[in-house]
Amino acid sequence: MTEFHSSCSRCVGRCFYCGGKSIKHGFTKENKQRYKCRQCHKTKVCSYQYQAYQKYINPYIISLTKEGLGIRSTARILKISATTLLKRIIRIAESIPQPSLKFAKSYEVDELRFFIGRKSQPRWLVYAIERETKQTACFYIGKRNNNTLNAVIKTLKNAEPTAIFTDKLKNYKTLIPKHLHKTSRYQTNHIERKNLTLRTHLKRFQRKGISFSKSSRITTAVLRIYFWGR
């Protein structure tokens, strides 16, 4: 429970959102004392009964998502609604900035096939990793066409890479300049190994499993947390 130390007759503590002074602001339906910040005007109570309002929930959501738990599994462990969890995942993902690409680096690009809702709706996850750091540089989800591939390739070309390594998929030849494109054997080992890790951690990408995605938006948010969340 948060303790408030009074410094005047009205101010009862500091706001943990902005650090401003908080004052009493009536009571909740459960007869709990409410507090309001005089600076950001946000309200709070000392202790929340619903777990989703706890400050530690968001870090737990990030941690459990990166460990590969599904939506309902995470909701059961944290004792919150699955609907609330979906909204929170989207909000967390939107707050995670995409890392800036470094200039004059080499990248590996590969694609994973999965489906949304049913197997008759296949999708591609196309992403790139920097060869030196092995970190994910960018990714895109879409249908199996050049537009999906080009969304990643175009981002990499803006960073003026020294080389882009891919498999021998014919689509890449029309998208990547010849002097940058490399398709030598064993040159995509790092991203191929990352594919295995990704399929192991996130069940929706497993080849033969009963888990699947219902929404491209949620899948994009989960990947953003998995790749760049901390």
Give each language-model segment a name.
Residues 1-230:
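Residue-level recognition of single "structural anchor" positions
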